[in-house]
Every structure is written in C-alpha cells, then in structure tokens.
Amino acid sequence: GSYFSSQSSTLPAAQKTGRLTIVPDSVVHSLVYDDAKNRVTGVRVIDANTKEQREYRARIVFLNASTLGSTRILLNSKSARFPNGLANSSGVLGQNLMDHHFMAGARGEIPGLKEHYYQGNRPNGIYIPRFRNLDEKTKRSDYIRGFGYQGGASRSGWGRGGSAPGFGVQLKRRLREPGDWSMGLTAFAECLPRAENAVTLSDETDEYGIPKLRINCAWGPNELAMRKDMADSAAEMLEAAGVKNVATYDLLKPDGLGAEPGLGIHEMGTARMGRDPKTSVLNAHNQAHDVPNLFVTDGSAMTSASCVNPSITYMALTARACDYAVKQMKEGAI
C-alpha cells in the first residue's frame, strides 16, 4: 500500500528467501548465554497457549522486540557474568528512556472555502522541520534542541453537533452538510536523554512468570521550557497564513498527565549506542560491547531522540548492522 507496513513490504521479501520461519504465540523469556564462550547461543521462549518453554539456537541473535520489550528481555537474561542483565557491564541498560512530547500547538478556521472538498483518498498532511537552535540566529536562551510541526486541514463533520448551538430538526439539517474548514499544527518535540528516566524489572511477574517492567519517566526542565513556544509559534504561523479564530492548546496538566511520556509511542534510548563500553551498551554497528554475536537495532539503540518519526532510522541502522554482521561472520569474528 501507499503507507508502509512490514506485512506488505519487508516480510514478503523475507519469505521469498525461503529462510524465514515465523513462530506465532511465542513469548520471549530471555536470551540463552554461554558464559565460557561469551556468546549468546539462542532464545528462550514460552508457548503462549501451553506455557511450555522452548529454546531456539543460533550463531547470531538480532534482538528487536521494541525498545521496552528488548530492554526487558536483556534485563531478564541474567548470568554469573551479567547479574544485572545481559551485556550490561556498563550498568546503563534501561536508562535514558526518551519519547517525543507533543499535544501542544494551535488550530483555527479557514474562511471562504465552503464549496471546496477533497475526493478519493485522504490528502496528505504537512510537515514543518525544526527551526529552533539551528544557528546563532535561531538560538533560544530558555531551551536547547527543538521541535517540528505536523499539521493538516479538514472539514468538521457531524461530531460538531455535540458543542454546536441548536437542537431538533434544524440542528440535524445543519449537520448533514460539511462544516467549516479548519487547520491545525501540532508540535512534535525532542526529549533529552536523562539517566533518571529509566526502566527496571519489577518484583511482579506476568502470566508467563516473566518480571514486569517498572517505568520511571517524566519530562525534564528542557522539555517543559519549550512547550509554550510550541503553541505560540504554531499560532503565529497560522495567523500569518490567514487562518481565523486561532486558539492555542497544551494538553499537559500540572500533575504531569495529559501529554505524558509514552503517548508519542516513540520510546527509545534504553540500550544506547556509544564509543565507550563504560557508558553505552552497543557500539556504532549496534553490536553489544560485551557480547559480540548480539545485535540490537530497534529504538533502544538510539542515543538521542531528535524530533522526527524514528522508524526509517531504525530500518537504516538495521540494514547497516546486518551488513556488518555478515562481514564479521565471513571473517570468523563471530
């Protein structure tokens, strides 16, 4: 389709190789580690239906269970050498959790277009790249890094009847026609990595006996400082474009809820890449510093969040890591 999905793109390509085996209803418990060889030797799974435990062996393991899933698996893969989680000699596994913060921006009405409507598939939205803290001219004194905008225009539907004046037959007749056009801009902003934003294993376990994750994460001073600018700049742009009755919004409440971490669904950073094994889990090729035949190429590898959707970056990192792993295998290094 026009919108990417693994089901329509990468999985069919993998199936055509004849070397893909999909094992459904398999819950990963941990990775199997050989202390004597310092290698992962496979994956330990639990059958979701029978609760039977099985192991799948492999020369090399790519762990890509999403940021929180991969981190949970690594933390639960304990051994004599790694009592605090596999490949965690640095102690930073689980730290520096990030997500994009958003739900702040502006929206207003577009006059004079009541006779215009779109046909066929929905039109695409717009994107405004980051424009803060790029150089001295755009530098802010109250925060570093910045945000971009995702936006679009639409006509209100019958749902506007919940707040529109009127009742009865007249209201119903009005709601049969498309409403006014409006346009909105929503900021997607960068979150800085901070060690205190972290996940650890809980004492509680799930139905498969696997420890749950305990998540401690909140926006820091830098994220909070940019949110007013996220809303005000959106309003300024819309008004300059001729949009009327512009109103700003920020759904983050004083108690920290409403726009809290996790709602962006772009979790990343908990098994970060880095040059120094003392401060990172993975090297520049997404290879674990501590365990050479283990690679992690999902969002947990990210060292910073930027302010853009990250999936294509994960795919690029995965392609590069696969190329490196193949070369390492051919050389007999892993």
Regions found by a protein language model. Give the residues of each.
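C-terminal lid/capping helical subdomain adjacent to the catalytic/cofactor pocket in oxidative enzymes
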Residues: 54, 77-80, 89-96, 188-198, ...
